[in-house]
Amino acid sequence: MKLSVNDLNVFVNTPKDIAKLCEDLSRLGLEVESCIPCIAPKNVVVGKVLEKAPHKNAEKLSVCQVDVGKEVLQIVCGAKNVAPNQFAPVALKGAIIGSTTIAKTELRGVESHGMICSSTELGFPKINDGILELDESVGELVLGKGLNEYAPFNTHVLEISLTPNRGDCLSVLGIAREISAFYHTPLKPIKALNFTPKSDSIALHADENIESHLAYYLIYNHSLKTPLNIKLSLAHNNALSENDLNNFIEFSTHFSGVILNAYGLNTTPVDLIIKNDENNLESVYINHQKRSTIAIKHQDQKDLSEHLLLEASYIDPISLSLKLHALKDKTLQKDNALIYRSARGSNPNLSDGLNFLSTHLKATILESKQTKHSLKDRTLTFQLEDITEILGLAIEEEKIQGILKNLGFKVSIKEPNSKPQILEVVAPNFRHDIKTIQDIAEEILRFVGIDNLISKPLNCVSSKNSNPHYDTHRFFENLKHKALACGFKEVIHYVFYSKEKQQKLGFEVLEDPLELQNPITTELNTLRTSLICGLLDASLRNKNLGFKSIALYEKGSVYNSKREEIQKLGFLISGLQKKESYPYAKGKAWDFYSFAECVSKVIGDFSLEKLTTQIPINHPYQSAKIIQNHEVIGVIAKIHPKVIQELDLFESYYAEIDASKLKRPAMLLKPFSIYPSSVRDLTLIIDENTAFSKIKKALKDAQIPNLSEILPLDIFKESDNTIALSVRCVIHSLEKTLNDEEVNSAVQKALEILEKEFNARLKG
């Protein structure tokens, strides 16, 4: 919205410091997007055209004699509307108009001693074609007086950005209220008009379901001419039109915030009916002819009638918005500017708008009518502690009451003797946005200043609202995605299987009393105790279909001999790891450790220990227990060649893991060293029955300083009972770069422990 500081002075005395005014308005939430000075140039004065004569050498030029107070100047003018006895702004010698400095000049052989100016030449919006005609609306016209000494020609135009909930500030009066409250300066109200009705020509009838509030003044029509101060105000707001009646209505709406309209009446009396039209929108009918749709569309103004019926209207903005939304698919005749004002909340004090308009029309009021409608007060009660809790700032009761009263709120103490005291606040009817205690707190904060709030960290305690079942589901879904990323394909099988096949492969079976009493078929006569049987069948089917590289994954239920359900993960690979493709012309076969590495990418790091008991499906020398977090969680093995031959499979490996023993890893942060590490490779002569896991555990338990890791490198037979085991010791510090002496010390301590615990020695 645009308005000038001169407009604001109609209702409130604004501060002289315009920059401070803009800053304070922005603090109040009325963001000033631009502030443009509109000041007439120096040496531009009020002049009066005494005579006008045609130029002897140019048809479109006139030679005027202009009185500028101290003297009469001859000025050549090209405007068509220049005329004798006309007051106009005159630029004297030395005045700067745009980029031109006015000086004595000769135009087509005639001397000119100045320039009669238009509004645009002076830096103001366009008012009309030709020169600007001055009138007494801007002040008493004194010949020779500087134009910038008149308030309308020495002002600033503010462009204010409003939030949608502040419809009360879509008027000069609304902004003036805010300034009055902030600077504690009195607001100049719109004067009420005292009049005696002189006719009874209007018969007003409104249907019972009408929500709008309407008020009317009947006046005599007379010749209208828009004064210059109104033209300037409307031009600043891009609302000036050629229709004088429309200018008065737009000006009064712009200033008062009341939605105004006028109807021309050629005959009286009239039947004035307010009812819903075919679209269920409230409309005005005069003598049974539709004349307007309230808050949506007004008829074009014509001021040729004998009488004028002035109308002020108000409709609840929420009700209007709901009606428009319900009709969004219909094509309606509507005025977007009118809807914009109405849907954001116009001024419901209708008499303000009618009185303001009637005063500027200088009209005699013949009659007034209004619908029976009253606005309900919006009352809120709260304690001071409520405001303190919302804002985080303790504010004195007197200050809160003062702010609210300055804004037009009615404030009272509901229960004077109660502790703490309860304040009762009635919001003014033009503040449609005040509905809750939070809105009251926001009003107080606007005037206290958000910069005065003490910055505090947010005290937020978030409880863990996790669902353990969902967490488990997500955990195994992630494992499945990892398996898919490693090339495994997910399969699903029945929980039923053949008891004989399970026994043949060495898996446990259900105890006889717990067996199925009525199996589906003889091939599905028991509950499965392992996922591997089904994976073997799936591998065979894929082999028969021509696939040479098979990697399968399954998660499902199995049962122990007691028929207790257990969730397990099964992995099986068969055939080639890499298909026949360069650089592997014959493909690349799987090996035990490659398969183990793939499984570890899915379930995490683990270690292996030798199986103590073997079953027919396992290869006796390539099978192991899977150890994770010091617990046996499953088995990994190559499938015995005899089983491969009997089932007609490719060379295969499997792993089966108890899902209940897999732990969701916690996110742990570990420090890392910025210093270089040192490695020492050792070849140890050691008993062939010594497991590497025991060697690693012994060195870890010894807590040798700076020894961070020990890795197996190679193994080969040394003698009948001994092997040569190559290991790598990784040595580094978090605090410094180690020297050779410190590195050798760590290695020596490791050798001493290995010699003591395992009778190991360095190979000579």
Model-found features: residue ranges?
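A carboxyl-terminal module marker
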Residues: K2-V5, R27, N406-G408, E415, ...
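Class II aminoacyl-tRNA synthetase-like tRNA-binding/catalytic domains
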Residues: G69, Q86, L92, I102-T105, ...
